[in-house]
Amino acid sequence: SGKYWQEGLFQKEIDLNMALIDEVWKKYGHHKSFQGWYLSQEISRRTKNMSKIYAEVGKHAKSVSGNLTTLVSPYIHGVKTDQVMAGDKALSVKEHEEEWDEILDNVKGAVDIMAFQDGQVDYHELYDYLVINKKLADKYNMKCWTNIESFDRDMPIRFLPIKWEKLLLKLDAARRAGMENAITF
């Protein structure tokens, strides 16, 4: 919803998403082009009950659609997040691993693909976070993709297109870390 889960109203978010899944599947599920689900809550830090949303909504989507693939695209709580720029502390690689290990343990069987957004950390840190993402995905039998942000967070004006050299750095870090696929926005 972009609203309820951010306000901590997790059951309302779950109910709304389940109704939407039912409606979308009824209307579009018969199309050959319908190949999976995107669970749209883009989170970073462990939030109380957030993994419950991923788990319940993901399992429901899979149950109504004959086990179609589910994808999440969270973000790394790094130095370029709005929260950190407003005074919150960025997660270290170790903290990121600990928090996401717990989240992914809670969503086993509900999420098939994890595609972390890559724009909230410094370029020199990206590879280390991607390695952890891949390690965790492997642990929980998920596919690990990268979601490459094709805009530049380092500019005072948000969001200008990224320079090719920076995009290439991100692609190379993803390749070296073993990402299985790349998407972008």
Residue ranges and their predicted role:
Residues 1-185:
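Glycan-processing catalytic domains of CAZymes
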